[in-house]
Amino acid sequence: MTLFELVKQTIQVLDAAEHYGLQVNHSGMCRCPFHEDRHPSMKLNERYFYCFGCGATGDVIDLVARLFGLSSFEAAQKLA
């Protein structure tokens, strides 16, 4: 199993988002950190995120890579 597969199977997007400071509401929505967002427009679930405002989308590795300006490999290492 690769590092990417391991991270994606063991760490949920919701958990990572909350761990890194995003405030996710009861319906899995939060304010998108990738654009100025006054109201929650990013939907998160266990496996992916999607912003209805700016179109940002991806899995847990993509989320952490974008949050911290990392490569996918660096984000996977940070999550491992």
Give, region by region, the residue ranges found by the protein language model.
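N-terminal structured subdomain of primase-like DNA metabolism proteins
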Residues: M1-A80
